[in-house]
Structures are given as C-alpha cells and as structure tokens.
C-alpha cells in the first residue's frame, strides 16, 4: 500500500496559512521531493514534476510579476493538474491573484509561510521524508546507550527484555520492547520507535508488563532513536567459534543498509547488560579512531618481529 500524507497534515505540522481551496486539503502528497517551478513559468513543461509540492520563493514570484497577466494565468493553469498536491509560498510574499484563480478552479490549496525559502524547503522535506519513509517491524529491543541506538535481537526467551531492564536501571533509555518499528528516512538513516500501544512498556517473564516511564521516570525512555548497532543474543553453542579478539566486524542488512552487528553468546554467569554497555562504548571508541583489537595485533606483531630479530 502506497503511503501518503495529506496537504492538511503538512499545513498543521508547519503552521501554514491557507490562502484558498480549503476543500482541497485532503489531497495526498506521495513524495518528499519538492519542485521550484522556475522553468515552468517560462513555458517549459516537458519534465514538469506535477506530483510534487510546488514551492514558490522570491525568485519565482519576482519572475512572474514581470509577465503579462494573461500569460501568467496560462502558466499557472498549466501547473494545476489532478496530481498537483499544493502550492506553497514562502517569506509571506504576496500571492499572485492569477495563481489563486487557477488554484481555486482546480481545487488545489495555496499555502503561505513566513519562513525563508531554503529553511521552509528543509522543514517540508524533513517532515515528508519522516512520514513517507518505508517501515518494517522487527522482533527485538531498542535501547539508547550512551547516545547510540542499540538494537538487541535474539530468539524469544533469550533474555532481551531482562537485559533492557538492567540497562535502564544503569541509566540508559528504553525506546521499544518486543516490536521495533524501523523506518528508513534516507540512504544512511534508520529510525526505530515503538508502536503507540506498547510505548514505554516492558514485558518480563514471571513479572508481567511494567511501565518503564512510571517506574523510572521520563528520563528512562525516549520515543525514537537512530539505530547504530545491532547486538544479537544467542544461546551458547560449544561447537561454534566466537570472535575472541574483535578484528572481524559482522554486518546485518536492514532494508538496503548494512548495520554493524555483534553476536553475544548467552550462558549463566555472563552479565549481558554490562557486556552490551561496553560494546556500545567500544563501538564509539572505534568511530573515534581507536581499535583495541587492531592495537593489540600490531603490538603482538611488533613483539614477534623484535624477538625474531634478537634470535637472529
């Protein structure tokens, strides 16, 4: 099913002034891309992106003011198609009466903002990308640990929720438990959040459902977080080789993005919350340019080389 946002949603989110065509506020917006219709004002419509929000700034309005009224009306009528969601005017500029007339005839809303064109463009794009981003649901727990979004995955009963509870007690923040909704806002960003019905809730076997915000306060939860790393919990397999140095970096694919992944084997006596906490800190350290595993390997190779030269 194609996701969409209505012009009314955009108007309310950005507090835009409605100039005309209130009945057209339910028109759908299907793309986050915007159009600055400069070439269209000159009569070039071969590649007119009619399905985009049409954004007018100082340049477009000033150019149209130099046109004859009949020509101006003709161009605006050409811009008004069945797929055109809305016209948005920035800087509180005066809206050409020909645009109002053409938009009224086609029942296309004309909106106005006091913001400068560039800033308004950023706000509209960010809002539409967030609302129109593809979404999937994953079984797991998302926790904000030292500013990193850590997605904890694993089979049912492996201890994900219990680990998240311990992390919350250690001062970190819960984003979602059991069902994590992940949306891809752009090519480099995955945002995780919780379905509204289970937001701030944590299920602990033997204890039941608890409300983390009620128990630990508003500082123990957050509504969404960018996913930075995946920690996969699995029952200890004595026949499986686990990385003991940390040179190898696993990846897991979410949508079309490769996310760093750490596999942590679970068995009695291992403090999973501390291990995951340290994994997050170590990941931050790697991003800052220091890799303990690589440093150890380099020091070991230097020592071996030094001993070899001494023996020679």
Swiss-Prot record:
Matches recorded under SUPFAM superfamilies: HprK N-terminal domain-like, PEP carboxykinase-like
Record-level GO BP terms: regulation of carbohydrate metabolic process
List of catalytic residues: 139, 160, 178 (proton acceptor), 244
Binding site for ATP: 154-161
HAMAP family associated with the record: HPr_kinase
Note: Both phosphorylation and phosphorolysis are carried out by the same active site and suggest a common mechanism for both reactions.
Designated name of the protein: HPr kinase/phosphorylase
Source organism of the structure: Listeria innocua serovar 6a (strain ATCC BAA-680 / CLIP 11262)
Lineage of the species this protein comes from: Bacteria, Bacillati, Bacillota, Bacilli, Bacillales
Gene name linked to the record: hprK
